[in-house]
Amino acid sequence: MAKIQLVAQANLPTEYGIFKMVGFEFPDTKKEHVALVMGDISNADEPVLARIHSECLTGDALHSLKCDCGFQLATALKQIQEEGRGVLIYHREEGRGIGLINKIRAYSLQDKGMDTIEANLALGFKADERNFEVCADMFELLGVKKVRLMTNNPEKVETMKKAGINVVERVPLNVGENRYNTKYLDTKAKKMGHYIVHNNDEQHLMTCPHCQEEII
């Protein structure tokens, strides 16, 4: 398969400031990915605050509380805005790579008691079908060699390092925990090795508006 190519770019004003939206495409499959770039990232020797964010329609656009994705996306963009410089790669691998419809099927199995890993396996998929190597190629096309990577996922860090991207710091992104996703976060920590810091202490439960909602 041919490597991904940078094919388009334009300014994108957002509530977090003006980003340059950069489009990438595989020439053979036409599979698309996107990056949002803020500020001057041309100095390859200066680490760039970065986030690899896998597509999550339910969390990012529909404000689902079943995961922490939407909260992580908003927090990452806000932190880049505060820094004045950074890159967010929007990795278009919905549902950890199984696609939106299969993600809904997995949610149905979770409604019946399975955790997020068990549901994927029951549908015939691996726990995580994503390929993060393409993200390293996108960083290279942007001229980014060193990153401070906002993630709780050790696989993203290791994949970037193996691909030649120098991850000088892992920046934790523990946000958005609520009563609907605590089990999901716990599963990611215990079964996938994610660096999850739980917020489910008494003070959090008493002050978080999501945790005060009626349990469905």
Swiss-Prot record:
Cross-referenced Gene3D superfamilies: GTP cyclohydrolase II
Catalysed reactions listed for this entry: GTP + 4 H2O = 2,5-diamino-6-hydroxy-4-(5-phosphoribosylamino)-pyrimidine + formate + 2 phosphate + 3 H(+)
Keyword Nucleus included in the entry's annotation: no
Cofactor note: Binds 1 zinc ion per subunit.
Binding site for Zn(2+): 56, 67, 69
Gene Ontology molecular function terms on file: GTP binding; GTP cyclohydrolase II activity; zinc ion binding
SUPFAM superfamilies: RibA-like
Tree of life domain: Bacteria
Any GO BP: riboflavin biosynthetic process
Database matches in Pfam families: GTP_cyclohydro2
Pathways per UniProt: Cofactor biosynthesis; riboflavin biosynthesis; 5-amino-6-(D-ribitylamino)uracil from GTP: step 1/4
UniProt-annotated binding residues for GTP: 51-55, 72, 94-96, 116, 151, 156
EC number: 3.5.4.25
Requisite cofactors: Zn(2+)
Designated name of the protein: GTP cyclohydrolase-2
Organism of origin: Haemophilus influenzae (strain ATCC 51907 / DSM 11121 / KW20 / Rd)
Gene name linked to the record: ribA
